[in-house]
Structures are given as structure tokens and as C-alpha cells.
Amino acid sequence: EGNMTTENGSLTYITEDGYVFDDAYKTVNGTELGNVAQDMAFCDGKIYIITQNGDENAVGTKLENDGMLIVVNAKTLKKEMAFSRSDLSTLDWPTHIAALDAEHVYIRDNKGVYRLNTNTKELTFVSGTDNAPKSRFVTMNGKVYTYKAGTLNGIIEISPENDNATKINFPYRVEISINEVLGIQAAENGDIWVMSFGFGKSAMNKFNVESKKIIQRQINVKPSVGSSGVAFASYDNNIYYADGTTIYRLKFDEDESLNAASGLDAEETLTDLSAIDNNAGLLYNGLGVHPVTGNVYINTIKSFAQYTQNTIWSFDFNNSAENPAAKYENYTNFPAGFFFAPGK
């Protein structure tokens, strides 16, 4: 993200062999990302990078950078297109992005979700997405998904066919009430993982948007959700989440003979990062899982005031929960999260 009043955003790239390229975007382009970088989307050989403030920070100070939305080549990181804050003046603090093609780029802001046609720079509000949550989209099967926050919640489906979203309700009767959705992610079989909370109970849910079938597994903690809206990360049926600096894993068993409470016994406490390293004072903006290796990536900072003392952790939890597979220190400035090219 960078410091929201004084710094531009940046992109740190870690190679397959574990080499770190600090501020890779600037290294390639000679210029910088916009202020408070928030989210990235991969589509058709391009990466779409959205920033909250672009070339003007929250207090109105102009900054020298490439703007609010930047489109780069996914292999070279070379800038192909840039949109300034004035180009996207309709948007109010954008935070998340998804892309289906050049004419269907979806951006979430404080009002809801807009569709951007990057060819014409036209922004169109998607009806039915009012107050869309500050959370990452799910993109699959040619559609984009977010969720409806609050007690009347469900999955919101956005199709490129029109600018009207469709709400898909969760089943009315469930073992663990869904009063609050903490986050969603795509499951490998086309279902959607849903982390939820209701009446004092947290659950991991696997939801099919076509049949509306849901499988629930209760967990013992209410996971921490960072400002980027990431509540958990998944690899196959392994779900990783955190409460403070303590990391947990749920091996999600879909056996229909099991009830939701079976998840309580299936949950594993893996490690407490603050017990390993005194500089791991805070988990910052969620977890990520490498789609090929299954290694879990975690960002920590010492404190908000001491954010330059930070660590990127990589764990192979099948091998060790105490000794990280890799550890990269002092590369981030308020990290927005981990982003991997889609597919295995």
C-alpha cells in the first residue's frame, strides 16, 4: 500500500527460486504505482492494479505516480495503460478489482461495484451491488462474484451480459446461522468457499451457486479479517485462517454423514508467529496460498508505528509448523496481500 499520506504503492515480486525483487514495478517502468495500492486482477495476459487514491492522497496532496488504475503485461510488468484519479473521478476510494475482458473490468468502491470499459473509459454502476463489501471478488466461469453483507446475505453474481447483479440466497435452514459473511473464495470444483459468523459461531461453508447446496463445518475462532477483506486462504480442501498471529488449518471433510460441529475437532492450531519472532506483532492483511506448492504466505509487521520492521513468511505446514520454508524481512510498506497467477 505504502504510507497513505506520503508514499506511493509498490509491488514486490518473489521468484519461483525465492529471489525477491523489491519494487518490481518501478524497476521495470521507472515510475511508481498509485497511492495505497489495494488489489490486483489477472486477465488475458494482463494484470489490473487498483489503488485507493491514485495520484492524489487522502488529504489532497498531488503525488508523482502512474495513477489510480494501471494495466501491465503479466509477464514483463511493463505498463500498457494507466487511468488517473481524474479519469476515474466517479469512484470513491476503490479497493477491489476483477476483470473478464477489456470491456468488463469490475471495481468496488464505497458505493458499490462499477463496470469499467477500458477502451472508452466509461464507468457504469452495476445495479444490485449497493454497499458491496470491502472484500476480494471471486472470478470463475465467466462471471464475477461478491456477497451481500448483513443479515439478509447471500452471494451476488455479476454477468457480462448486463449491468444488473443477481442475488443468490443461502439456504434458509442451516446448522450454523449465517448472520455475517467474512469472506469468499473460489473452490476448485466451481463451488464458493464462504467464511461466516452467526450467533457466536464461526463456520466454513462450501456453497454451490447452482443447486444452492451448502456444506458447513464449524470452527473454534472468529478469524481476523484485514482491511483488504481477506479472511482465509484455501488449497484443495485445506482452509487456512488466523486469529491474531495464531494460524489455524481446517481440513474440510465433505462427508455428508458428518454434522457441522465435526469441524471443531478437525481444526488444527498450527503456529503462533509472535512466539517465533518478537517482530511479528501484528498479522497484516490476511494469508495467501501458493497455487502450485501449497505453501502458506503470511505478512506480519511489528506495529503500525514500526511498520518498516516486517516479515513475509512462507510455510510448508505439512513439513513444519515452527520453521518457515522461507522468511523475507523488511520488504513491505503496509502490504495489501498476496497475489498469484490463476491456475495450477
For each predicted feature, which ranges?
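Acidic/polar, low-complexity intrinsically disordered N-terminal segments immediately downstream
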Residues: 1-70, 74-78, 301, 305-320, ...
